A protein has these predicted regions:
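A short, N-terminal "cap"/entry segment at the start of jelly-roll beta-barrel domains
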Residues: 1-50
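Conserved short histidine dyad/triad with adjacent acidic residue
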Residues: 39-40, 52-70
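Short, charged/polar surface micro-motifs in flexible loops or helix N-caps
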Residues: 46-50, 58-62, 82, 125-127
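A generic "binding-loop/recognition-motif" signal
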Residues: 60, 71-72, 90, 106-107, ...
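Short beta-strand His + acidic residue motifs that chelate non-heme Fe in jelly-roll/DSBH
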Residues: 66, 85-86, 102, 108-114
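Glycine- and acidic-residue-biased ligand/ion/polar-headgroup-sensing regions
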Residues: 71-74, 78-83
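A short hydrophobic beta-strand segment most commonly corresponding to one strand
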Residues: 75, 101, 115-128
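Short acidic-glycine-tyrosine-enriched beta hairpin
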Residues: 89-104
């Protein structure tokens, strides 16, 4: 199974216990960053605000610009594609298999490479 097929499997997966089908959840455009789509697969409503999980697609050569989450720790699991992640202190290549952890108040931006990049993002506490 390719990494893109793995991402698609998550996009159409199910949440055990609630039997929630992720395929029924609509992708939406990020309100600030062109070329970025998100799917909220587990939200604060289901976790009492404790955490949330999101699938993120960044189109080729597009980016999630410099931003910060004041209250959430965020993790990224890169499922498909390549790109670059920059923080104030570091710059690292993003590619399939890379995991990044950002404590609250960490500024970062993610730029997708030529094929785009697909990320599984998790927030503690929940983003939304």
């Amino acid at each position: 199974m390719s990494s893109r097929e793995t991402f698609d499997a998550f996009s159409n997966g199910k949440l055990t216990g609630l039997e929630k089908s992720f395929g029924d959840i609509t992708w939406y455009l990020h309100p600030k960053f062109e070329g970025v789509e998100m799917k909220d697969i587990i939200t604060s409503e289901e976790t009492e605000g404790k955490f949330s999980f999101h699938l993120v697609k960044i189109a080729p050569e597009k980016k999630i610009g410099l931003h910060i989450h004041e209250n959430q720790l965020e993790t990224h699991e890169v499922i498909f594609g390549e790109g670059l992640c920059k923080t104030e202190d570091n710059e690292c290549a993003y590619k399939s298999g890379r995991i990044a952890i950002f404590p609250a108040k960490t500024k970062r931006e993610i730029t997708a490479g030529a094929e785009g990049i697909y990320i599984f993002a998790k927030f503690i506490p929940a983003l939304k």
